[in-house]
Amino acid sequence: MKGLMCAKYDDLVGNLQQAHGEARKWWAINSHNELVELFVNNENGAWTIIITRSNDPISCALIGGDNSGANYDIDSTVEMKQ
């Protein structure tokens, strides 16, 4: 995952929570057995998607944005089967 913002899972999630006010709103396991998560700040609409490999303690922020305008008052999970 070269060129991405990567850190230990707890450090990356802690930064999203503390510095950006984002909380996990959705997660899924993809076909490569990687954890994909969406973090959202409900006040300003900022969001970040991170990915974590099952065999690696490092997580990477794939993409993020501001003012999405969507309602993230959800708590859903999806597990994709191989």
Language-model regions, residue ranges each:
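Polybasic/polar functional segments that serve as interface/processing modules
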Residues: 1-82
